[in-house]
Amino acid sequence: MADRINESHQRFLQALMSHGIMEGSAVRALHRHCCELHKVHYMHDKLDDFVGVLNRHLQPLFMTIEKGVGEEDGLTYYALVNRVENDITKMASDYAENELELFRKTMELIILSDNGFATSISILNLADELQSKKMKKKEVEQLLQSFVQEKWLIGRNGEYTLHTRCIMELEHYIRNTYQDVAKICNVCRKVAIQSQLCENCGIPLHLQCAGKYFHGKANPTCPNCNESWPHEIPDLNQVSSQGPSHSQTETVRGRNQRSKNTSTASRTSR
């Protein structure tokens, strides 16, 4: 495929920007639609080349289209990532200062949690801790709905975790801000919000990474220390269709207690 950008690339980029993040099957359909609409030769196996052309043109703007895997469903996603504004300031045009502060504190609750979730009650209680303008509980509830709609958070059964878009766009921020506590998957080396931890050495694995790594192994052992893996191996089909359950993301009891104590101390010192 030629390295020159054309109308099909431009339309593809506009659609991706308007969605913020798109699942792989939708991106493949968009690729075909853009090529056919602008009468550009379409090849179903050339999506990576198509995106590569865009990325070469986006590079001087410090932007790139990245591919990631959703922790909730194990599916592939594409998102446009700004390499300069790789922290929460990129949200400043959409949210007020106190709303951004609430989002930062919500992220911290999720990242420091044992299972990658924060309850709605714990987030509502943050309204009284804001250093900027205080918020009413009703305002926090409405703001959480906005974060979910804009694909910064995922809400389920009164609990919240980070959306794939948030993890992809703010990965560098998470690594830099929480470098001592942020979990990094031992298999894919990406930030792991929901994960399983080794009972012995404490290394984390994404659920889908654990499922792939241990697939077909009768006696799974930790990829780092070779000790027996203490968790139920995630069913990749179940993760993809339903998302992970809390039992899948929970660590062993002893590790959980140590992490909980560390998290409490960290929050107290902040």
From Swiss-Prot:
Domain of life (superkingdom): Eukaryota
Biased composition (Polar residues): 237-251, 259-270
Subcellular location: Nucleus; Chromosome, Telomere
Top enzyme class: transferase
Record InterPro entries: C1-like_sf (IPR046349), Nse1 (IPR011513), Nse1_RING_C4HC3-type (IPR014857), WH-like_DNA-bd_sf (IPR036388), Znf_RING/FYVE/PHD (IPR013083)
RING-type zinc finger locations on the chain: 185-226
Coarse class of the protein's main subcellular location: nucleus
Pfam families to which the protein is assigned, alphabetical: SMC_Nse1, zf-RING-like
Listed GO CC annotations: chromosome, telomeric region; nucleus; Smc5-Smc6 complex
Protein's GO biological process: DNA damage response; double-strand break repair via homologous recombination
The enzyme's E.C. designation: 2.3.2.27
Record keywords, A-Z: Chromosome, DNA damage, DNA recombination, DNA repair, Metal-binding, Nucleus, Telomere, Transferase, Ubl conjugation pathway, Zinc, Zinc-finger
Gene Ontology molecular function terms on file: protein dimerization activity; ubiquitin protein ligase activity; ubiquitin-protein transferase activity; zinc ion binding
Annotated region described as Disordered, given as residue ranges: 236-270
Catalytic activities: S-ubiquitinyl-[E2 ubiquitin-conjugating enzyme]-L-cysteine + [acceptor protein]-L-lysine = [E2 ubiquitin-conjugating enzyme]-L-cysteine + N(6)-ubiquitinyl-[acceptor protein]-L-lysine
Function noted in UniProt: RING-type zinc finger-containing E3 ubiquitin ligase that assembles with melanoma antigen protein (MAGE) to catalyze the direct transfer of ubiquitin from E2 ubiquitin-conjugating enzyme to a specific substrate. Within MAGE-RING ubiquitin ligase complex, MAGE stimulates and specifies ubiquitin ligase activity likely through recruitment and/or stabilization of the E2 ubiquitin-conjugating enzyme at the E3:substrate complex. Involved in maintenance of genome integrity, DNA damage response and DNA repair.
Protein family according to the UniProt entry: Belongs to the NSE1 family.
The protein's assembly and partners: Component of the SMC5-SMC6 complex.
Protein name (Swiss-Prot/TrEMBL): Non-structural maintenance of chromosomes element 1 homolog
Native organism: Xenopus laevis (African clawed frog)
Lineage, opening ranks: Eukaryota, Metazoa, Chordata, Craniata, Vertebrata
